[in-house]
């Protein structure tokens, strides 16, 4: 059984945290984030740390309080360091380019795929085959990366497509004559 929820989240100097009912708010150098905690979980802010515990001793509440503690820790990391994902593009003629608040992707279709960059997310393209996605909200950074990857997921025969930089693509052998 995991005991992630028992550890308090220590709030460093330079970050302000507040708990009002079920809403946890954190402000830091990278912005402000909020998280609404489930009703089965109780959140307290005292002595410079946020503690999370279940209101009732049910299996559901015990499962949720570990998740809530991890979400609060992600808020803290987001407002201090931020989150970043790197995507690699592999394939002949596959490339990415930024055009203002839009990401243009040439992924082997008859047309270019244009992705509107949401607010709070920063995308940089240092090379035409690399995309860096950064922001202060872990969930939104991961969601944007997953949406871009879904336009052309890597295929197992040649490895062409958009993949996470740390992702391993299991390669298959083609059929033999």
Swiss-Prot record:
UniProt GO BP: cytoplasmic translation
Family as reported in the entry's similarity comment: Belongs to the universal ribosomal protein uL6 family.
SUPFAM superfamilies: Ribosomal protein L6
Gene3D superfamilies found in the cross-reference section: Ribosomal protein L6, alpha-beta domain (3.90.930.12)
Entry protein name: Large ribosomal subunit protein uL6
GO cellular component: cytosolic large ribosomal subunit
GO MF terms held by the record: rRNA binding; structural constituent of ribosome
């Amino acid at each position: 059984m995991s005991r992630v929820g028992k550890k308090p989240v220590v709030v460093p100097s330079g970050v302000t945290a507040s708990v009002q009912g079920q809403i946890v708010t954190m402000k830091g150098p990278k912005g402000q984030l909020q998280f609404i905690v489930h009703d089965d979980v109780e959140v307290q802010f005292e002595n410079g740390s946020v503690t999370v515990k279940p209101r009732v001793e049910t299996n559901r509440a015990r499962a949720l309080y570990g998740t809530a503690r991890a979400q609060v820790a992600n808020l803290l990391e987001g407002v201090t360091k931020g989150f970043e994902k790197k995507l690699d593009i592999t394939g002949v003629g596959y490339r990415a380019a930024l055009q203002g608040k839009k990401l243009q992707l040439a992924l082997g279709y008859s047309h270019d795929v244009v992705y509107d960059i949401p607010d709070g997310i920063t995308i940089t393209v240092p090379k035409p085959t690399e995309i860096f996605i950064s922001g202060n909200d872990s969930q939104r950074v991961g969601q944007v990366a997953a949406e871009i990857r879904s336009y052309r997921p890597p295929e197992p025969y040649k490895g062409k497509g958009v993949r996470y930089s740390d992702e391993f693509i299991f390669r298959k052998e083609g059929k033999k004559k």
